Amino acid sequence: KDGPWGGGNLFAINLKEYLEKNNHKVVNNLFDEDIDLILITEPRRTSESSAFTHIDVQNYIKYINKDVLVVHRINECNERKNTKYVNKYLIEANKTADFTVFVSRWLKNLYLEQGIGVKENHVIYAGANKTIFNNKGFHNWDKKEKLKIVTHHWGANWNKGFDIYNQLDELLDDTFW
């Protein structure tokens, strides 16, 4: 999906670009009968970045292609956003997957402790789009120019580093910065 829909969406966009550049066909729905691999990144229908749910995938397996492999990428949890339903939902959705990819070891351990299946799983850290995030034109801060701060987080969720942003904001009141 185009637009600022978070890390999972950017992961999907970057993966799609990489696969297509390497002559692989990528589809964003479950209409084709010969899909080799389904990647579940957001199984919650209520999310705007969700293309399909784990139930849609189960139906695809049952009625269209029983040989498709399913990978579930997990990058969300209750502890991160102080919710109460996400972990249970993702653990249930994960039962559809053949393989699980976690975005961090911490997240993997959290879900293993909470009872997610111990099937094939790996931690794969997210990478950045090198056309955007690179050191072209980089120069060391000379402490005379204004300090420029860039964050990869966006949104109004207080659990995404607000305490750090608040400390930075207080530092900016100091004439040194």
What role is predicted for each listed range?
Residues 1-30:
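N-terminal subdomain of nucleotide-sugar transferases
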Residues 1-4, 41-44, 151:
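Nucleotide-activated donor-dependent transferases that construct or modify glycoconjugates
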Residues 23, 27-96, 106:
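Extended catalytic core of nucleotide-activated donor transferases of GT-like folds
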Residues 67-69, 99, 120, 176:
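Proline-centered loop/turn at the N-terminus of a beta-strand
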Residues 82-84, 112, 127-146, 160:
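Acidic anion/phosphate-binding donor-loop and adjacent secondary structure
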Residues 95-120, 128-132:
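A short, active-site helix/loop in glycosyltransferases that binds the activated sugar's phosphate group
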Residues 124:
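Hydrophobic residues at beta-strand termini and immediately following loops
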Residues 140-160, 166-170:
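Conserved donor-binding/catalytic core segment of Leloir-type glycosyltransferases
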